[in-house]
Amino acid sequence: MIGNWNYGTGRRKSAVARVFIKAGKGDIVVNGKPISDYFSRETSLMIVRQPLELTNHAQTFDIKVNVSGGGETGQAGAVRHGITRALIDYDATLKPALSKAGFVTRDAREVERKKVGLHKARRAKQFSKR
């Protein structure tokens, strides 16, 4: 994928997305499938399209995405982050608007590890006074 493609890497939770954009008619392909087939939830589709709609480029680019790891929400967030970075690679003047919307910042929240002696990361056994 060399030539007139712009590239961006996005990450969210344990998902990693590699995003390639080029001038086109608005087709988005994720792991070889159309976006509406890959993401089943409407919220995931909305999350992915946010940077394109904010910059009025929804019908301007063809986008190819390779995404792995995580679940549906994490992958959608990773794709959004990757699209944002690819748009900035294409046109740096879009960065202030995307930054203001919070799409440029990587969401650094990760799953907290489970601790020994607890049920989950923080959930302890029920305390009984008597």
Curated annotation (Swiss-Prot):
InterPro entries referenced in this protein's UniProt entry, alphabetically: Ribosomal_Su5_D2-typ_SF, Ribosomal_uS9, Ribosomal_uS9_bac/plastid, Ribosomal_uS9_CS, Ribsml_uS5_D2-typ_fold_subgr
Biological process per Gene Ontology, one example term: translation
SUPFAM superfamilies, per database record: Ribosomal protein S5 domain 2-like
Cellular component terms per the entry's GO annotation: cytosolic small ribosomal subunit
GO molecular function: RNA binding; structural constituent of ribosome
HAMAP family: Ribosomal_uS9_B (MF_00532_B)
Protein name: Small ribosomal subunit protein uS9
Organism: Burkholderia pseudomallei (strain K96243)
Primary gene name: rpsI
